[in-house]
From Swiss-Prot:
This is Photosystem I P700 chlorophyll a apoprotein A2 2. It catalyses: reduced [plastocyanin] + hnu + oxidized [2Fe-2S]-[ferredoxin] = oxidized [plastocyanin] + reduced [2Fe-2S]-[ferredoxin]. It comes from the Bacteria. It is an enzyme of class 1 (oxidoreductase). GO terms for molecular function: 4 iron, 4 sulfur cluster binding; chlorophyll binding; electron transfer activity; magnesium ion binding; oxidoreductase activity. The lineage of its organism: Bacteria, Bacillati, Cyanobacteriota, Cyanophyceae, Nostocales. It comes from Nostoc sp. (strain PCC 7120 / SAG 25.82 / UTEX 2576). The gene is psaB2. Pfam families: PsaA_PsaB.
Amino acid sequence: MATKYPKFSRDLAQDPTTRRIWYAIATGNDFESHDGMTEENLYQKIFATHFGHVAIIFLWASSLLFHVAWQGNFEQWIKDPLHIRPIAHAIWDPHFGKPAIEAFSQGGANYPVNIAYSGVYHWWYTIGMRTNNDLYQGSVFLLLLAALFLFAGWLHLQPKFRPSLTWFKSAEPRLNHHLAGLFGVSSLAWAGHLIHVAIPESRGVHVGWRNFLTTLPHPAGLTPFWTGNWGVYAQNADTTGHIFGTSQGAGTAILTFLGGFHPQTESLWLTDMAHHHLAIAVIFIIAGHMYRTNFGIGHSIKEMLNAKQFFGIRTEGQFNLPHQGLYDTYNNSLHFQLSIHLAALGTALSLVAQHMYSLPPYAFIAKDYTTQAALYTHHQYIAGFLMIGAFAHAGIFWIRDYDPEQNQGNVLDRVLKHKEAIISHLSWVSLFLGFHTLGIYVHNDVVVAFGTPEKQILIEPVFAQFIQAAHGKLLYGMDTLLSNPDSIAYTAWPNHANVWLPNWLDAINSGTNSLFLTIGPGDFLVHHAIALGLHTTTLICVKGALDARGTKLMPDKKDFGFTFPCDGPGRGGTCQTSSWEQSFYLALFWMLNLLGWVTFYWHWKHLGVWQGNVAQFNENSTYLMGWFRDYLWANSAQLINGYNPYGTNNLSVWAWMFLFGHLVWATGFMFLISWRGYWQELIETLVWAHERTPLANLVRWKDKPVALSIVQGWLVGLAHFTVGYILTYAAFLIASTAGKFG
């Protein structure tokens, strides 16, 4: 008899009901719970999947390069990046009639195409690619690399090439290799690429495989390096009149500290970025030699964490949180490690979102408004999902991997012991922010509705304006630090030589970029709305993790695992008690809610900056109807009109996605509100009808149909809610921005 799915669980494979499929999907990635899984095998499997993951990333990047080279307009776009729309790929759609074919033949193409809003054109242009041939070469190279990684993944599953458990548990060597090798050397390699290829290309000098060993990136060669006269590399930078991609106004410097933006491309100076990556490389390569390996020199992390002395001073006291036992707890728990890594990566991605628009690194991307909006939203959403993952795995860690004996008196133990104080403080601050922010919005809404807008409560964000002024923004007239030429920020070493200040001060005060946007009462309010979203999401996440082991309602919770059905025997009222339901399921709704506010704010604020009409945001963002009417409703116009009785336009696909997204989102509520009994009865009715319908009853299935559990229903609801939410806003964002700016 053929083995039924899933092969990883004999118990599930023998389940006679459709539960078999549901539970198999739910536990497919929970390798720990699979039959015959050992700790060593677990580490080996996860290690091998990393190679597959990297291969998929290379394959994806390769496909972008290939399709743009084949069907895009990269070479035409380079000639006029501000006015030509970059093409992602062609569209072949049998449904397209003549109007659709005409509408989607855009970006200079004579056949239907999709416009690219990912910023890859700007990236490839900045790093020195100039021809379709360059793109094809990159594509083939990445394809070969992907194949190599797939082979490496397969190889590391073979008995002879499987690393041992001790190898996986060697924290110090891994840290050294990742710091020096992964971050350090790759940053050095990137600095090398920028200096040897990208900077010469930006000055009209082509560097390819044939001449890159013979073309000096700097006229003085390596002499200044060997003689310690490094300042030579910063002399003769590109002038403010430099035309990117040509020798006009170009200098010879390769490592600079100019600050601000290249006037023509409105992106960071390539020579500044090369300097940055070189500095990062040096720091990380040094950091990768700090930890003790086979040679007996360097730091032992375990010794440092368990130390009671810090440079001869006793460290264990009320405020010096002791870390004894943390090394083994962390090193032996994959969930603990994953939790911290997800939290760190999530934070980094949110920082990427904030910096990509305010300090654009790629040439001309600052003026591709739709791409700017798409990239900001994309990175903030991914950051949100990663942060939820961090807390979900923290919950699993507390249940499966935490040992109270091993962690007595350390940070983990202390956090657990005063979790009530942490959770109640988060609750208090969420309530405070929620009532006060909503109270002011509602008050303002009412007085505007009654025709007395002058009675609004409008609060200037003076502290935030002070911080902006301290960084050099002159508009507020605060005359402090960098906005005051006589202050210590100006006169102190090393800035008395004005290394980077002139360009930075020009940039921060230009008014046409996104650096330190001018803020007022509308920003003050939405800032606190976002703070409410952040604190509420944090409350749910932290409570889900810290209450995972047990609460007053359910003291033995940890014995039930990370997720369990609600209202078990004799446990009425225990729905939404499991760590899964709190740290993952409930937290996701608030995470999405928060991301809505963050992206609405960013987008509406920027529409005003880009259109030269900042008054609309400033005047209408202080009351609720302003957000509904002047941001959401007004910007939905293009979407609602995407296809109409008079034909179609190139926004019609987004208009369709906008409608479809709403449908998917609304479907979620059907699963979120109706519980198990409804689904069981519905399924039984459908089965009854199926078995009595001629022809249809020729098809039978062996599994007895069983309805979703409440928790499974919620998961289906959550999936629809999330996907619909994202589809709806993505379509809205792209169409409303592209509709205005072409």
